[in-house]
Amino acid sequence: RRENNFWEQLVYNTPLKKGLISSRLRLEHRFQEKLPLQANLSLRKFTFSSRIRYRFTYQYLLTQSDVKVPINLVIFDEVFIFLNPNGTPYGFNQNWTFLGFKIQFNKKLVLSAGYQKITFKRSDNDYFKNRLWTNTLVYKL
């Protein structure tokens, strides 16, 4: 189903001698298409919901700081919490954990790759767990 999101976020970075600690707080707003899906665009309806996401990231520089292509070990954990319509947190949605590497080829091109585990709450006491290898290639214009 179709989903459109927009968000606001705050990021706070703490540089370390051979690494970085980063905290990100994101307020996410979601417009999700209601089921059943409609072929006729004029009949489509969307629901609105919000959630808070908090990510804590630790990066450790594995190479010398002056190398042309630095490689970092990256560990993060991100928790997703649903908000009710008046903005009060009310329930766990999902959790992402990641262990991998970040390779900075130059100022514009970065590759992150590693193991990610996603825990998603389906209903009370029913959690779906997905384990996967994730590759993310970012090119800044």
Where do the model's predicted regions map?
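Hydrophobic/aromatic-rich structural module bridging two neighboring secondary-structure elements via a short loop
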Residues: R1-L20
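Residues that define the transmembrane beta-barrel architecture of outer-membrane proteins
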Residues: R2-F6, F46-Y54, G91-T97, K129-W133
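Residues on the lipid-exposed face of transmembrane beta-strands in outer-membrane beta-barrel proteins
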Residues: E8-T14, L25-L27, I52-L62, L99-I103, ...
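Membrane-spanning beta-strand positions in outer-membrane beta-barrel proteins
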Residues: V11, L20, R55-Q59, N72, ...
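Transmembrane beta-strands of outer-membrane beta-barrel pores
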Residues: T14-L16, L27-E33, D77-L83, K117-K121, ...
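Repeated loop/turn-to-beta-strand initiation elements of outer-membrane beta-barrel proteins
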Residues: K17-I21, S65-I71, F105-A113
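Extracellular loop and loop/strand-boundary signature of outer-membrane beta-barrel proteins
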Residues: A39-F46, N84-G87, K121-S123
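Predominantly the C-terminal beta-signal and adjacent terminal strand-loop region
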Residues: I75, N86-G87, F92, W96-L141
